[in-house]
Regions:
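Intrinsically disordered, low-complexity terminal tails/loops enriched in metal-binding residues
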Residues: 3-210
Length: 210
C-alpha cells in the first residue's frame, strides 16, 4: 500500500510539473527524464495501473466486423492528425485529415443498423466538417482549434462503437489560454496536441473507453 501511494504521488508530481512554466532548468531536466520513462512501453503499463479515471464501455456491443474496422480506421487517421499536432507539423495534420475524409467517403452506411446509423450520422458529419477545415487551415494554431471540435465528435463516435482497443480521453486545462480542451489517445502517456513541443506532457487522463 505504501508503494502504491508513493507511485500515485510521483505521477501527480509529473503532471503538475509538466503543466507549469519551464523556467526552472534543474527541475525541467528531472521532469523530462521522468516523462521519457513514462513514454516507454514498460512505464506506460505502470502509469495505467495508477490512473484514477473511470472506465466506460462502448454503447454498441454487437457491431459487425466491417463497421468495427471502419470506426478503427477513422480513429487511426484521427491519431495521425493528433501526432502531427504534437509535433507542430501542419502539413502532416492535413495529410491525416485528407485520409480520414477518404475513408469516410468510401463507407457503406447500409452496414449499420438503424440505431447505429443514427449515432454514426450524428457525429460523422461534424467530423467531416472539421477534418476539411484542418485541411484548409493556414497554420497549426487554426488546425488545433478545429481539432478540438473534431475531438468532441470522435469521442462520441468511439463511445458509441468502440475502437477495437483501449482508448484514453485526455484533458489539458491550459489549452487555448486556459479554456481547456480534450483529445483522445492510444496510450496512457500524455502527448498534448494543443501545446505541441512547448509542453507536450501537460494534461491528465479523464476516462478510459473500452
Amino acid at each position: 500500500m505504501k508503494q502504491l501511494v508513493i507511485a500515485i504521488l510521483a505521477v501527480s508530481s509529473i503532471s503538475f510539473a509538466a503543466c507549469n512554466s519551464g523556467n526552472q532548468t534543474s527541475e525541467n531536466k528531472d521532469t523530462m527524464s521522468m516523462d521519457k520513462m513514462a513514454m516507454s512501453d514498460t512505464s506506460s503499463t505502470t502509469l495505467t495501473a495508477t490512473i484514477d479515471a473511470p472506465v466506460i464501455k462502448a454503447s454498441f456491443t454487437n457491431v459487425s466486423t466491417d463497421v468495427a474496422a471502419h470506426i478503427a480506421e477513422v480513429a487511426s487517421h484521427y491519431f495521425h492528425i493528433k501526432h502531427a499536432l504534437v509535433s507542430n507539423d501542419s502539413t502532416e495534420a492535413k495529410n491525416g485529415a485528407t485520409m480520414m475524409l477518404q475513408v469516410i467517403s468510401q463507407f457503406d452506411n447500409s452496414l449499420l443498423s438503424a440505431d447505429e446509423k443514427a449515432a454514426y450520422t450524428e457525429h460523422i458529419s461534424a467530423i467531416k466538417e472539421h477534418a476539411d477545415a484542418i485541411i484548409k487551415s493556414a497554420d497549426v494554431d487554426a488546425q488545433r482549434m478545429h481539432f478540438a471540435e473534431l475531438s468532441m465528435h470522435e469521442y462520441e463516435l468511439i463511445k458509441a462503437f468502440g475502437a477495437g482497443k483501449k482508448i484514453y480521453y485526455d484533458h489539458c486545462p491550459m489549452a487555448f489560454n486556459s479554456k481547456g480542451a480534450n483529445w483522445l489517445s492510444e496510450s496512457a502517456a500524455i502527448q498534448n496536441p494543443y501545446m505541441g513541443t512547448k509542453m507536450p506532457e501537460c494534461g491528465s487522463v479523464e476516462q478510459v473507453i473500452e
